[in-house]
Amino acid sequence: MKITLLSAFVAILIVVNNPSISNSASIIPPAEIIFHWEDHFNNKEKEKIETWLNKTALATQQTVGNYPFDIHFYIHRADNAKEPVPWGNTERSEIQGVTFHVNPNFSLEEFLHDWTAPHEISHLAIPFPGKSNRWFSEGFATYMQGQILIEMGEFTPEQIETKYQKKLSNCRPYYQSDSPFIVVADSLKRNHHYPEMYWGSVTFFVNMDQHLQKSEGKSLNELLQEYQACCRSNDKNLNDLIRSFDRLTNDTYPSDLLEAYRFGKAREVMSEVGK
């Protein structure tokens, strides 16, 4: 039976809102949020930005599990920007955090509706996979941003389903190649086809979620919640992450799927999505 992205999202919401499921993974408390004001903001602007990022960080951890480290937010002004958050990037060192450039003239509602913070904060749920595995990290964050926005109540599952199906449909033609998936993704990145690289890579996590639902009756989000509690602090790279996924699921599917994306023909990998 074909499992759609919508059904995956619905299952995730059930897990998040079911205490008997989520409490087992919530061994650690929510991360402490630490703000660094890199430019001048008045008190009203600070309150709005803190409300936005605190709500987003909470929804992120309700989705993927509580982070076992403090989260640092570095806030810069971008008064001339035509959107609330024109730029954001993660900080990956001894400190785990995100740098945001923001235009504080936008409303709180516009900040909460923006995808940048869910995308960037979700990156921190997994160790930095390395520059050569950017397809993996960006596919992960792009997949998670929609689920976090649903948790925040900013979009319905149906709206995210429609958006994701459209994005996946648009990027499929770029992967009609006999070259390995990661080779095609890397070529798209070099040629600045970033949306196609991001959304094509989302399929890895669609496949993971669908396999988990069919084989174990759990979602990718539930697996991530378990992962934060047991393994996030110790894992250092992509191989560590996948080994942890194998161990937590008692299954080699995560490592087998990674091998398929590393060595399988791109067109064949893409054709398997949703089956």
Task: Put a short name on every predicted segment.
Residues 5-11, 54-55, 230-275:
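Beta/coil-rich, acidic/histidine-enriched accessory regions frequently appended to metallopeptidases
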Residues 155-211, 223, 230, 234-241:
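Long, well-structured alpha-helical subdomains associated
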Residues 28-45:
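Acidic/histidine-rich, surface-exposed loop or edge segments in extracytoplasmic proteins
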Residues 151-160, 212-220, 248-257:
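Structural helix-adjacent loops and short alpha-helical linkers that scaffold large soluble proteins
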Residues 41-94:
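Auxiliary, metal-adjacent structural segments of Zn-dependent hydrolase domains
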